[in-house]
Amino acid sequence: MPNASEHSFPFPILIGDIGGTNARFALLTDAYGEPKQLAPIRTGDFATIEEAMQKGILDKTSVQPRSAILAVAGPIKGDEIPLTNAGWVIRPKDMLAGLGLEDVLVINDFEAQALAIAAPADQDVVQIGGGAVRPFHSRVVLGPGTGLGVAGLVYAQHTWIPVPGEGGHVDIGPRTERDFRIWPFLEPIEGRMAGEQILCGRGIMNLYRAVCAANGEEAVLADQAAVTTSALSGADAAAVETVSLFATYLGRVAGDMALIFMARGGVFLAGGISQKILPALTKPEFRAAFEDKAPHSALMRTIPTFAVIHPMAALSGLAAFARTPRDFGVAMEGRRWRR
């Protein structure tokens, strides 16, 4: 755990959520003000993140940030951090040398999502089903997106500690008769079926094609957006079943994560897919699958589940951390660079 002297960053602080398609930034001028949202930057529009930050942010504001706290999708090892789903490579030493920064911290993207669920505002979440939050108990966040992100959040020594991992790659298997009809048509990864093969954007298409194949039908919808839109409107029966099954399987995995972390503080669904298919998630299938964990179904009924509807949840989490770093046990060794 970093000591207290390590838990401070000079203001102004630039916070950033660096995704595969878009990079979203905000400026925090002090510990008391709200972050100033900046226009999103498409990662494909700039060759490097340094160029994007210079031309897309610094050249357009009179505020010179002294620190940067960035959340990225990718392993954080060494002085060069390649993004999982984009061409950029994060080089913190180059940021210190070329952008006038004094302090750079890089964390996992789902650590930021976990930070955001420490104290979410009521208007930023929608409860799905029953259960009640137990304060200061463990929490879990799952986010179907480009992949399936998972992180825990545990409270110890008066500190919220995010626990990132690769929970999206746990095994997932068939349980019902319908599952067994669909499963042979799902595309595995290296011979096995991981949660991320179904519970993400491309996973929706994997599941849709398998549903169509099990029905002996042609898959006519071309992409994830078409499937979810057709499902919510009821225009395509295979799409409706796909999204219903997606909600069921997400409920199963979310329930597993709740048991692993004993997440009496709640299980939170983050990301754009969860927001888009919220009408499907509020139907009985998700919550029924979540609670169907014999011999612990009674326990599961007490654990609340939520959809995060804040449009910039990761930035909200980063801002909370930047304001009061001592409230969070974010590991910094090997992930922080200073001049």
Curated annotation (Swiss-Prot):
Gene3D superfamilies given in the database record: 3.30.420.40, 3.40.367.20
Catalytic activity of the protein: D-glucose + ATP = D-glucose 6-phosphate + ADP + H(+)
Keywords: ATP-binding, Cytoplasm, Glycolysis, Kinase, Nucleotide-binding, Transferase
Cellular component, GO, one term: cytosol
Pfam families per UniProt: Glucokinase
Enzyme Commission code(s) on record: 2.7.1.2
Binding site for ATP: 16-21
Main location: cytoplasm
GO molecular function, one term: D-glucose binding
Taxonomy, superkingdom: Bacteria
An example Gene Ontology biological process: glycolytic process
Subcellular location: Cytoplasm
Protein family membership: Belongs to the bacterial glucokinase family.
Name used for this protein in its record: Glucokinase
